[in-house]
Design a protein with these regions (language model features):
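N-terminal secretory targeting modules
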Residues: 1-82, 90, 94, 127, ...
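Acidic/histidine-rich helix-loop elements
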Residues: 45-47, 51-58, 100-114, 142-148, ...
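Conserved beta-strand elements of the Class I
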Residues: 82-84, 104
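Pocket-edge structural micro-motifs
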Residues: 85-86, 243
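Active-site metal-binding loops of divalent metal-dependent hydrolases
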Residues: 87, 108, 138-139
Length: 267
């Protein structure tokens, strides 16, 4: 009984000490508790499966780690280009649309700019490219994995560009693509991905590229319709381009890459 009482006193002292320590944290008041949103029959289970993994590796750096290790250094004179992005990049068949080019795909579906920033050193810098093509932001606006304001998205763009500059890697930013809600698969697409917000971020990104001397690949203008939405025949789900969409994007990317490679990298 005495042993139990001593143990109970010890627990109470520990709890009181922990509570007192908590009061001293600069981050007080306590962290917020967020109610989970109903993400629907497909995104809900996907998110439930994904979030525990992200708690261990938010940037998902493990996904390309084996491929990065196996990839040899660029040959003398080779101008390697890394495409960094989300599912729109992940689904882009670079060998098909850029035959013979030493282009490396490092897209990961559903990712946001904060995740790409976390893996930038591993998936871009370590591969020693001459240039990087960054296509990101549409998932940030959606808020599926990370709630980001436009200013926070822009800060992530800038941070990735700063890292590239530090390592003498030329930078190409792709505009966020338009989206649409024309089909049943896309009927809720505009609820969280507001077209006017996408356009505002693109305007900022284009101005940022002009200011820094980066190349801006304007996919948006090549894919948008008269309603300022993604052209109906270029997608089935309102967000991911079909091969016909990538066929329009490829020459825009190629021209931006060519301009970037002719320029001097920022120091």
């Amino acid at each position: 009984m005495k042993r139990f009482a001593a143990l109970l006193v010890g627990v109470l002292i520990f709890a009181a000490t922990a509570a007192s320590a908590q009061d001293r944290y600069q981050s007080s008041p306590e962290r917020r508790v967020v109610a989970e949103k109903d993400w629907g029959p497909w995104l809900g289970p996907f998110r439930a499966q994904l979030v525990p993994s992200l708690m261990r590796d938010f940037g998902e750096r493990y996904l390309y780690a084996p491929a990065n290790t196996a990839l040899p250094a660029p040959r003398p004179g080779e101008q390697r280009v890394v495409f960094l992005g989300d599912s729109i990049t992940d689904l882009w068949e670079l060998a098909r649309f850029f035959p013979g080019k030493p282009y490396v795909n490092r897209g990961i579906g559903s990712q946001v700019t904060a995740q790409m920033l976390l893996r930038f050193h591993q998936d871009v810098v370590a591969l020693k490219p001459s240039a990087v093509v960054i296509l990101a932001g549409v998932n940030d606006v959606h808020g599926f994995l990370q709630q980001e304001t436009a200013a926070q998205i822009e800060a992530n763009y800038e941070a990735m560009a700063d890292i590239a500059d530090r390592h003498h890697i030329r930078v190409v930013f792709g505009s966020i693509l338009p989206v649409n809600n024309y089909t049943d698969n896309a009927k809720s697409m505009l609820e969280d991905r507001h077209p006017e917000e996408l356009r505002a971020i693109n305007r900022w990104l284009a101005a940022f590229c002009r200011e820094r001397g980066y190349q801006y690949a304007d996919y948006y203008s090549a894919l948008v319709d008269d309603h300022r939405l993604l052209q109906r025949d270029l997608t089935t789900d309102g967000i991911h381009p079909l091969a016909t969409g990538y066929a329009r994007m490829a020459p825009i990317a190629a021209a931006a890459i060519a301009r970037a490679l002719r320029s001097h990298p920022r120091a």
